[in-house]
Amino acid sequence: YIKDRNAWETEYIIRHSYKYLYLSNESNKLAGKEAVGTEIESEMWRFGFGRLSGYGYKLGESAAIIPYYSYTLNWSNIDFKKSTAESVNPNEEILNLYDETFRFGTSSEGGVRIKIIDNLMFDAGYERSIVFQRHLFWKWAGSAIIEATAQGLLDGFISEVFESTPAAGPIVNFLLKNALAYGIYELRQDKMNWPFSSEAPIAYDQFKFGVTFVF
């Protein structure tokens, strides 16, 4: 579901919101790479739902460029494929906990969406995602509330920027939202439910490019 509207009483800034369900497949094979030595190939099926939002600059009647921040909740099934080399991976025991089972996780993404016409958009982004060993609901909820509160505090500051300098608002929103998300995910590299005591998750970082058709 996509919604665009003019923002902050200007004719050149829009508020872009995109809520979605998705199913994806990610694999080393898509990049034409094979595991060497202790390296491990993986193939991951993932589904979930998310929300993408941002403020953008109108370039015409329908065209716009939109720096965005996105957050998803998802479930992943990862199939780890070991190298044929006779070598032992020190993380093999941990990886076996995830192998070919569905696990809960979250991700955040920052990028730029270029809207050509109402029905066609191009995306380029950088995503950080984590897959939990176990879903400890109360610890996860506490960590999520801390992140949501921090994002809410940023919204107040960003609103002040828009009121004083609307043209700078979309860039400030993009930088601050994604900087906070990046920092939170760094803290979760060792504790998946930071700041609460919990195991380290599996983490994926990747660049993404895509095309979105709107019907």
What kind of region is each of these model predictions?
Residues 1-4, 45-57, 71-73, 108-114, ...:
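Residues on the lipid-exposed face of transmembrane beta-strands in outer-membrane beta-barrel proteins
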Residues 1-16, 27-32:
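Start-of-domain marker
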Residues 16-23, 67-71, 122-124:
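Membrane-embedded beta-strand positions of outer-membrane beta-barrel proteins
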Residues 23-46, 76-105, 135-144, 182-202, ...:
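Extracellular/periplasm-exposed beta-strand and loop segments of Gram-negative cell-envelope proteins
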Residues 58-62, 115-119:
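Outer-membrane beta-barrel channels and translocator barrels
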Residues 65-67, 106, 120:
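Hydrophobic core residues within well-ordered beta-strands of beta-rich domains
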Residues 117-215:
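Predominantly the C-terminal beta-signal and adjacent terminal strand-loop region
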